[in-house]
């Protein structure tokens, strides 16, 4: 008897509004509607399928099993007329494709191509280093009043420092003459090379203002002549200092034995930065120092005003203001390291969802903006940069900020099926730690206070351990990957879900303004996983707590 194995999932994603799902398998690709759930389009042999909202335009990339379906070829398809609009071939395999109503962005391993989606004209090319995971995000809002940004991880930077590499954090600032110079804006025809700490812009051997670099060279020669006189004077001083340097060399050896570097420099690799690129002006705007470790996931909000990031460690999630680069929220996803698969903002920027290898989806509420000084804003070190022996780890990992306390004035909903001893202990620990947060924040220094202000999740739910999807596409170590998105706010009849609404809680603040007092406003959260399952959960925006599973479908057998 032959066993009919389900196809391997190569790609799965939501569209910009979360109303549709695109999935590509070895057997082809399909487009599903989320509400009501159902398939409405399918074709074969594609590895990437990107939608433009709910329009008939699709950007697809071949699976590579046939010459006509190369992984280097991007094809724009009109699903209404079943016609090919255009095809573009690139020098290497395509890792990701992102679209909004003005721009199309294609990510290769070491290049990013930006097109005008209206006429498919190439506007700009960005040279970068290897981005194997295809981590990239663009803002999707079609409104001209909203920002249109591209965000992607910055290439690693190697810097020389007297501080040993195992003692460094991500907020080291190296004073250099080049850092004080202001870079000119980029021309749309220029390429951007992010190398080291500077942005190199070259166009036909001329500077951006069109003047030849030779004029600048003449001025530099005059400065060099003046500097020669100073160098001669310095040589005399250096000769006098040779004797004292010999004495310092013997002292530096003793410092090196104790782990402190004296005069020798060490090379430090600086990771965890994110580059913001303006898709309208075609200019990079800033580099945000997000984490100490490499970036694992990032996303821009729908209106392009917020950026959320997570590192490979996965314990801390940070949210930044795109205009200023300031860190405005810091959330603690968990205590133990895990791989974060995706981050997603709600359309109104009130919630942020994170999926990870732990199979628990965490929802954070973006309420009161965190008050940070300029020094604290640069203090983006992860938890392991502090000595856990100096801090009660049970208190630190469970503290919540005042912004969460107000939103949890009502007891959150608790799913009785998830009741465990560990959850009971964690809940009591969180209640005690919230009461101590204010006092501890005043006692500990600034670096520790930055950790104390990290907020825990507002709501969460655990994905089912088994599903009916049957897909065999998994992540590293056999983990099932998942991505999330928020739907539009809906109204539900509370009498149909007594396990959520009828637990003796005061729900009058969440009752709709309509005449029917049973209607409740709820926030849908949609999840698709690499095993071929689609989950539809709802979140109580006032109480939080455990989310309720409304429906579940297989996107492979439908």
From Swiss-Prot:
Residues 176-264, 400-432 are annotated as: Disordered. GO terms for cellular component: endosome membrane; phagophore assembly site membrane; vacuolar membrane. It is found in: Preautophagosomal structure membrane; Vacuole membrane; Endosome membrane. Pfam families: PROPPIN (PF21032). WD repeats lie at residues 4-42, 290-330, 335-374. Keywords: Autophagy, Endosome, Membrane, Protein transport, Repeat, Transport, Vacuole, WD repeat. Gene3D superfamilies: YVTN repeat-like/Quinoprotein amine dehydrogenase (2.130.10.10). GO terms for biological process: autophagy; protein transport. Its main location: membrane. The PI(3,5)P2 regulatory complex regulates both the synthesis and turnover of phosphatidylinositol 3,5-bisphosphate (PtdIns(3,5)P2). Necessary for proper vacuole morphology. Plays an important role in osmotically-induced vacuole fragmentation. Required for cytoplasm to vacuole transport (Cvt) vesicle formation, pexophagy and starvation-induced autophagy. Involved in correct ATG9 trafficking to the pre-autophagosomal structure. Might also be involved in premeiotic DNA replication. This is Autophagy-related protein 18. The lineage of its organism: Eukaryota, Fungi, Dikarya, Ascomycota, Saccharomycotina. A motif (L/FRRG motif) lies at residues 331-335. Residues 210-252 have a biased composition (Low complexity).
């Amino acid at each position: 008897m032959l066993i009919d194995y389900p196809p391997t999932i190569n790609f799965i994603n939501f569209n910009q509004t979360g109303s549709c799902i695109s999935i590509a398998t070895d057997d082809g690709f399909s487009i599903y509607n989320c509400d009501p759930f159902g398939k409405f389009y399918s074709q074969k042999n594609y590895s990437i399928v990107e939608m433009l909202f709910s329009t008939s335009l699709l950007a697809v990339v071949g699976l590579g099993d046939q010459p006509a379906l190369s992984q280097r070829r991007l094809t724009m398809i009109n699903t209404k007329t079943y016609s090919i609009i255009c095809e573009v071939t690139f020098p290497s395999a395509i890792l990701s494709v992102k679209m909004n109503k003005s721009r199309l962005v294609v990510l290769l391993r070491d290049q990013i191509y930006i097109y005008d989606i209206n006429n498919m004209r190439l506007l700009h090319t960005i040279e970068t280093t290897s981005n194997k995971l295809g981590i990239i995000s663009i803002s999707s809002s079609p409104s001209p009043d909203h920002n249109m940004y591209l965000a992607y991880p910055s290439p690693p930077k190697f810097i020389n420092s007297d501080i040993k590499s195992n003692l460094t954090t991500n907020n080291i600032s190296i004073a250099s003459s080049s850092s004080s110079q202001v870079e000119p804006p980029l021309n749309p025809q220029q390429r951007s090379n992010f190398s080291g700490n500077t942005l190199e812009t070259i166009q036909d051997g001329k500077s951006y203002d069109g003047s030849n670099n030779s004029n600048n060279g003449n001025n530099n020669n005059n400065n060099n002549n003046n500097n020669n006189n100073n160098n001669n004077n310095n040589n005399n001083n250096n000769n006098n200092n040779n004797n004292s340097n010999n004495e310092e060399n013997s002292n530096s050896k003793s410092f090196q034995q104790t782990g402190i570097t004296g005069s020798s420099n060490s090379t430090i690799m600086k990771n965890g930065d994110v580059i913001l690129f303006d898709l309208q002006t075609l200019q990079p705007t800033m580099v945000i120092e997000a984490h100490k470790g490499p970036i694992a996931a990032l996303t821009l909000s729908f209106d392009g005003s917020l950026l959320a990031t997570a590192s490979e460690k996965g314990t801390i999630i940070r949210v930044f203001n795109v205009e200023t680069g300031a860190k405005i929220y810091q959330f603690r996803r968990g205590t133990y390291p895990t791989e974060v698969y995706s981050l997603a903002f709600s359309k109104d920027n009130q919630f942020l969802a994170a999926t990870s290898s732990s199979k628990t989806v965490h929802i954070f509420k973006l309420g009161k903006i965190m008050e940070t000084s300029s020094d604290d804003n640069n203090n983006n070190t992860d938890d392991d940069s502090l000595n856990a022996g100096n801090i009660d780890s049970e208190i630190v990992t469970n503290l919540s900020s005042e912004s969460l306390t107000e939103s949890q004035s009502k007891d959150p909903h608790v799913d009785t099926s998830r009741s465990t001893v560990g959850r009971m202990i964690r809940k009591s620990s969180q209640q005690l730690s919230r009461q101590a947060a204010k006092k501890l924040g005043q006692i500990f220094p600034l670096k520790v206070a930055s950790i104390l202000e990290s907020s825990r999740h507002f709501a969460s739910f655990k994905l089912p351990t088994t599903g009916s999807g049957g897909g065999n596409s998994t992540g590293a170590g056999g983990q099932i990957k998942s991505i999330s998105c928020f739907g539009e706010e809906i109204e539900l009849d509370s009498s149909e879900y007594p396990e959520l609404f009828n637990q003796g809680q005061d729900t009058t603040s969440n009752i709709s303004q309509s005449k029917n007092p049973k209607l409740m406003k709820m926030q849908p959260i949609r999840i698709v996983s690499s095993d071929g399952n689609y989950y539809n959960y709802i979140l109580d925006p006032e109480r939080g707590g455990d989310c309720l599973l409304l429906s579940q479908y297989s996107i492979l057998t439908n």
